[in-house]
Amino acid sequence: MLTSLAHTAVCVPDVEEAVRWYEAVLGLTVIWPPVLLENDDIERDMGELIPAPVAVKGAILGVGDAGVSGDRVLEVIQYPRAPGRAKRADGALTDHGYSHVGLVCDDLAATRADLEAKGVRFLTEGIADIVGLRTTWFEDPWRNVFILMEKRHPEKPYYSQF
């Protein structure tokens, strides 16, 4: 039986560069610094998913007390030995829409302005108001998509705002 949601992972071509960006631009905190995993354990875990020799370089970042609770973190992953391919030119991440990471802030307009000043590329023109949320979409330098949300009722989960 499932008991919680542990993490969301995004893949990047350079973990160290991505960690610096997520710290400097989004203000995330490094919980587990970049480390290269290339032992028998990772081979048993992912050996059927990625080409040999299996290697994963990863870091874990969070917001607030994420490091205390251990879950609800962002895992940043690089597969240093797997051949990469460019993201689609049309911007779609999949044939079925946008896979994305949801982030919550307390002042969407101010947070968007701060991120724009840091050079973040937004995918939407402004801020939308939907079902009790204010939202805007952006991407990181590796074209991972994020939705930034401000909740009308901060004490409730994002999906219970209406």
PLM feature segments, named:
Residues 34, 78-80:
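Short, small-residue-rich loop/turn micro-motifs
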Residues 67, 76-77:
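Unchanged
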Residues 39-45, 84, 124, 128:
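A cross-kingdom feature marking solvent-exposed beta-strand/loop segments within repeated
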